[in-house]
Amino acid sequence: MSTILHITASIRGDESISRALSSKLVERLSGTDTKVITRDLSQNDIPYVDADRFAANLSPYTERSPEQQELAAIADTLIEELQAADTIVLGVPIYNFSVPATVKAWADTVARAGTTFEYTPTGPKGKLDGKKAYITVASGGTPVGSEVDFMSPWLKFFLGFLGISEVEVVATADGIMGEGGEEKIASAHKQVEQVAA
């Protein structure tokens, strides 16, 4: 049985293009015995990391206080989702040239030294190798892959930092708010079909 972790982040719900693309990709990648774990970051259920959560996340499980166990519970769950997945599909919009704040909160939460990456004499090394990730990107005005797109390269780098180096991006071209928006969305859907052919 294979496992797909489907992460979405758009606040636009059913109107979201990035969510529609990622959902289509998950559907096409899924087989009869595929387990799909869904995590909707737009629900704002991931708190931002503060000093107490940071300390709890770094504490060995057996040494955590009851308060630390509670603070670290969401991080444990999110990390377990990543560890269990063979494939990660992220549907992420570009907001103000970068990732939604909830995606950054997710990243800060799952980046745990000794668990998802480790420090070595030659530098940090990811511990989640052997997985493949797909990022479906939608942008209203920021051209995906341009010098003002700080989302796509950052997210690819972060996944690589965790050891997920095989990352494929499917994106709407040049922003969809201007002329030809519907054609750009249709083209992105065709990309999904080709990726999962």
Swiss-Prot record:
GO molecular function, a single term: electron transfer activity
Name used for this protein in its record: FMN-dependent NADH:quinone oxidoreductase
Reaction(s) the record says it catalyses: 2 a quinone + NADH + H(+) = 2 a 1,4-benzosemiquinone + NAD(+); N,N-dimethyl-1,4-phenylenediamine + anthranilate + 2 NAD(+) = 2-(4-dimethylaminophenyl)diazenylbenzoate + 2 NADH + 2 H(+)
Family designation: Belongs to the azoreductase type 1 family.
EC number: 1.6.5.-, 1.7.1.17
Record key words, sorted: Flavoprotein, FMN, NAD, Oxidoreductase
Summary of subunit composition and partner proteins: Homodimer.
Lineage: Bacteria, Pseudomonadati, Pseudomonadota, Alphaproteobacteria, Sphingomonadales
Biological role stated in the UniProt entry: Quinone reductase that provides resistance to thiol-specific stress caused by electrophilic quinones.
Cofactor, how bound (note): Binds 1 FMN per subunit.
Transmembrane segments: none
Coiled coil region boundaries: none
Pfam families the UniProt entry points to: Flavodoxin_2 (PF02525)
Keyword rRNA-binding: no
Cofactor(s) this protein cannot do without: FMN
PANTHER family according to UniProt: FMN-DEPENDENT NADH-AZOREDUCTASE 1, FMN-DEPENDENT NADH:QUINONE OXIDOREDUCTASE
Top-level lineage group: Bacteria
Organism: Erythrobacter litoralis (strain HTCC2594)
Binding site for FMN: 10, 16-18
